[in-house]
Amino acid sequence: MAPTLLLLLPALAGLISVAQGQAFHLGRCPTPPVQENFDVHKYLGRWYEIEKIPVSFEKGNCIQANYSLMENGNIKVLNQELRPDGTVNQIEGQATQSNLTEPAKLGVKFFQLMPTAPYWVLATDYENYALVYSCTTIIWLFHMDHVWILGRNRYLPPETVTYLKDILTANNIDIEKMTVTDQVNCPEF
């Protein structure tokens, strides 16, 4: 057992260095309840990122996502951000509803060779806000959280943000590292 742990330590140290700034925790992923009676058709359209737990692949501001239905029944995901140099960075992926008994548990994939990542809609009223959670368990010992608070507009009232953060804390999801996404003076993409 000890030699196995010694082999894992460098790998774990590498994971921790890659995950700096991200929400990296001991133990397996929490399993919070998702939005009941989720209707993906009402969810489609443009969402603006209001707050998030920082992720290595989002470096800009004015971050937004646009969801549209594809002919094959999957959901096209187009994420866009404004880079510090003024250029627009975008990435396109697909989301699928793999569990029809829990339609708010989607999976999203941006690259063919990458695994599908969880995309769980914990709460939404479809017209104003959405709370999205993603978590990956790493070798049964650690997990990495991703959280996004989204709005149909670039601004959400503070009481709505507090309500959504309360959902997270009630489900043992750490919100300490959440940051506000700059949505001021943003161009239309």
UniProtKB/Swiss-Prot annotation:
Residue spans crossing the bilayer: none
Pyrrolidone carboxylic acid, modified sites: 22
GO molecular function: cholesterol binding
Compartments where located: Secreted
Pfam families: Lipocalin (PF00061)
Signal peptide per UniProt: 1-21
Record keywords: Disulfide bond, Glycoprotein, Lipid-binding, Pyrrolidone carboxylic acid, Secreted, Signal, Transport
Functional summary from the UniProt entry: APOD occurs in the macromolecular complex with lecithin-transport and binding of bilin. Appears to be able to transport a variety of ligands in a number of different contexts.
Oligomer and partners: Homodimer.
Official protein name in the record: Apolipoprotein D
